[in-house]
Design a protein with these regions (language model features):
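The start of beta-strands in P-loop NTPase/AAA+ ATPase cores
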Residues: 2-4, 53-54, 117, 243
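Short alpha-helical segments and helix-capping/turn motifs at coil-helix boundaries
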Residues: 6-8, 39-48, 98-109, 226-240, ...
């Protein structure tokens, strides 16, 4: 199953808010770069009957809104459970705080040996940085470019060389960075899941210390799980600081 990074560029005019270009770059084969100038062709590409792709958008919450708009305007139905899948349906994984994690679109489901679908994830849940910073921090040989984002592009706009180079670098940067992550076996949907999987692999007593709770108990406390975050102050970045301290304090989050 091949994996690609993907990106949309859109008009900023509220009265003509649409995708004027899309781009894809294969992870592990960055010479395979694909682009077009409308969302219809993007969806047609995704619906390849011979292959089910996995895509990564950087900030799926933004691009996903355009995907939803197209699907709902073209006869697709959202379903809550994959067991309900049928032709032209899709599922979503979105948190109660509006965080987008995944979209799965089912194009054809009648063949029991091959369900024609595309799975879309948010690479920002793996690398929570801007594309520009990712290129810098990974020491990539390419960098993010610039275009005039406010310029109006009409329907059918033919991309200039500058625009092609811009969107190509965006998806290629992400493809190169994700390839590095995947080679390090960091393949989960989120970096938090990768961290937990790594911790479980080194703590053989994990299941004894943190047993799976009965459903009723979990349901009672589930709403208290809102997580937290790990942050590195820039003044300490890439510096030896000596011994540190660990604080476990309640009620400091959020």
């Amino acid at each position: 199953m091949r994996k690609f990074t993907a990106d949309f560029e859109t008009n900023v005019d509220e009265l003509d808010c649409r995708v004027w270009t899309y781009a894809l770059c294969e992870i592990g084969n960055t010479d395979n770069f694909i682009y077009g100038n409308n969302i219809e062709d993007f969806i047609k590409w995704c619906a390849n009957k011979k292959e089910n792709y996995v895509l990564y958008f950087h900030n799926l919450k933004f691009d996903g809104e355009y995907i939803f708009s197209y699907l709902l305007s073209n006869g697709y139905k959202v379903i809550k459970d994959k067991k309900q899948r049928e032709d032209k349906t899709f599922t979503t994984l979105i948190s109660d705080m509006g965080q987008f994690y995944s979209i799965e679109i089912y194009f054809e489901t009648k063949n029991p040996k091959h369900v024609n679908k595309v799975t879309i994830y948010d690479s920002q849940k793996i690398l929570n940085m801007t594309v520009e910073k990712i290129a810098e921090d990974f020491n990539l040989p390419i960098k993010k470019l610039e275009i005039d984002y406010k310029e109006y592009r009409e329907i059918g706009h033919i991309l200039t060389e500058q625009e092609v180079n811009y969107i190509r670098n965006d998806v290629e940067i992400m493809a190169r960075a994700l390839e590095i992550m995947f080679k390090e076996n960091l393949t989960k949907m989120t970096i938090g899941s990768d961290a937990l999987a790594s911790y479980k692999s080194i703590n053989k007593n994990f299941n004894r210390y943190f047993p799976v709770l009965p459903y009723e108990i979990d349901k009672d406390i589930r709403q208290s799980y809102k997580g937290g975050f790990t942050y590195l102050n820039d003044i300490y970045k890439e510096k030896e600081t000596g011994g540190g301290i660990v604080l476990d304090v309640n009620s400091l989050y959020p």
